[in-house]
Curated annotation (Swiss-Prot):
A cellular component term, taken from the record's GO annotations: membrane
Extracellular side: 44-65
Protein name: Uncharacterized protein ORF65
Membrane topology summary: Single-pass membrane protein
Length: 65
């Protein structure tokens, strides 16, 4: 899931809710998809951090030899 796509959907949802004063965003489906969206971002960031850490460890290991 791409972040920009995800946040655009959320912004569109909030905008639609304000425009028509209909609780689209607070519906179960949308809140679940938003949760999944935030979760995917969290996983992406944590994966990137661990990947960078592994790379730095890898390089330092071979430089010390």
């Amino acid at each position: 899931m791409r972040f920009s796509n995800c946040f655009n959907k959320f912004k569109f949802c909030i905008g639609t809710e304000k425009k028509y004063s209909f609780p689209i965003c607070t519906s179960t489906y949308t809140s679940f998809s938003l949760f999944a969206c935030i979760w995917s971002i969290f996983i992406h960031i944590s994966l990137n951090k661990s990947f960078i850490y592994q790379k730095s460890w890898y390089y330092s290991f071979f430089q010390n030899r």
